[in-house]
Amino acid sequence: VISRKGAQFACIDIKNFYLDTPMEDPEYVRIKITDIPEEFILEYGLAGKEDKNGWIYFEIRRGCYGLPQAGILANNLLLGWLEEEGYYEAHSTPGLWRHKWRPIQFCLIVDDFGVEYVGIEHFNHLLTLLKKYHQIQTNMAGDKIAGINVQWKFPGRWVRIDM
């Protein structure tokens, strides 16, 4: 970023990345009614729905935390959307993405994007694409990505990174 004339840096975080991902086939889980908080039992009308051994059965249709395939399903969907819009992963650097012709590149860490761009319209192109599918949060100062604090001085062409 500091070596590219006119470049800026911003961060994008996809909210509920795994939770928004539809699954090709549903999964099933059973949970003891005694392990479910009373407030959830009341809110979802679960009282009396348990079997004779106290189990309640659920069908999972969207990704959820703890589901082994949730990460790969979410990631595959995201990569497909990016590729459809002209983004591609750099051959030499896994996790670094570029666009075929736009002056933009980003590192992708699960659901966090560290975006270098020249011209806000190119950043907005990526932003619009992601907003089609997910709720997102942007950090235009680009001062925090994946738990890393970043200090930028673009005119002085220096950056400080700390954790």
Report each predicted region and the residues it spans.
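Long, low-complexity, charge-biased intrinsically disordered regions
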Residues: V1-M163
